[in-house]
Amino acid sequence: MPPMLTDPGLLAVDNVQSLSPYVPGKPIEELQRELGLTDIIKLASNENPFGASPRALEAMRRAIGETWLYPDGSGHALKTRLATKLGVDVGQITLGNGSNDLLVLLAEAFLQPGLEAIYSQYAFAVYPIAVQATGATAVVTAANPPGSAMPLGHDLDAMARAITPRTRIVFIANPNNPTGTWVPAPALKAFVAAVPAHVLVALDEAYFEYTGGLGLQDGVAWLAEFPNLVVLRTFSKAYGLAGVRVGYAVSHASVADMLNRVRQPFNVSVVGLAGAAAALEDTDHVAAAVKVAVSERARVAAHLEKSGTSVLPSAGNFLMLHAGVNARARFDALLRSGIIVRPVANYGLPEHLRVTLGTPEQNDRFLQAWEP
């Protein structure tokens, strides 16, 4: 009789065994259980505090009556609306269960052992998970130093130097999460133009809607010029649909074809498809939410700086604060006040905290609790 296997998890491949799982922001329900609090605000996961468009909510309510049916696996209706809005062909769009899903699809389709993917230090935590799971090699380039014009942001020169014949993907979030920092459009476009043809540039634009007036790119407008560019966006942030998980990639049609070969069937729910299609049409709702976030970004940052807290430049709906050696203690103190923010020690930034911009009232409550 063969010996009994006491830990079947050890059967997993080595590159998965060595992974650290993604840790999301602390849920409200968890804090309720732990501290017995009821008046809680969550400023941890960069969600839209105004929620989804009323049109999206109504569309999703109607779609609930169809949940006994599989969704349209091609997502044709949503892709058609996206194609019209973005000025691209339907065949250039791939839908995902959030843009995280699309990051994983890119890795599955274009990486394998012996190949490399590049991303910057302090880049989004899903990049290493997606890369390492394929057995490919992650090449992490140093970020800008703390005293630079865009501290802790992407160093494009370092990323360019890291490209080799084995490189297949360069991941760049602009603006970056968790830092909020960004690369101006001219510098980023020059970088993309210099990337060799055997390398895909995965341009993560999850916070695209919040970047107006700061000189960032509209990556979709570059696709005709750069066939190796893949632009990723989401309905989770400005559109307020984080809970139903809908994202999309826009790329050359041949890249979309490869992504669809590894995409799981029916990866976006019938409720998500309906909500996203309706949300896309309610431009006033998105514009109003973005306007508040951008205004609050400036107000909250100025207040914090005036009170002695260093804040990184941000083009997203969040701010990265330098909280010092007591960052964990300050996070815990905020929890006791019923405010959830995001520690980023797992990014190698143990002295920082990331704070989502909520409603003005929520932000005032945070600022009051933050005062020493």
Question: How would you name each of these model-derived features?
Answer:
Residues 145, 294, 298, 303-337, ...:
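Conserved PLP-binding catalytic core of the aspartate aminotransferase-like
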Residues 333-337, 341-342, 346-372:
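PLP-dependent enzyme catalytic core of the Aspartate aminotransferase-like
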Residues 228-312:
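PLP-dependent aminotransferase class I/II
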Residues 132, 149-165, 178-201, 205-238:
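Active-site pre-lysine segment of PLP-dependent enzymes
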Residues 39, 89-93, 113-116, 166, ...:
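Short acidic capping loops at alpha-helix termini that bridge into adjacent secondary structure
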Residues 109-172:
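PLP-dependent aminotransferase-like
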Residues 62, 66-116, 134:
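Phosphate-binding glycine-rich loop
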Residues 2-69:
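N-terminal "arm"/small-domain region of PLP-dependent enzymes with the aminotransferase-like
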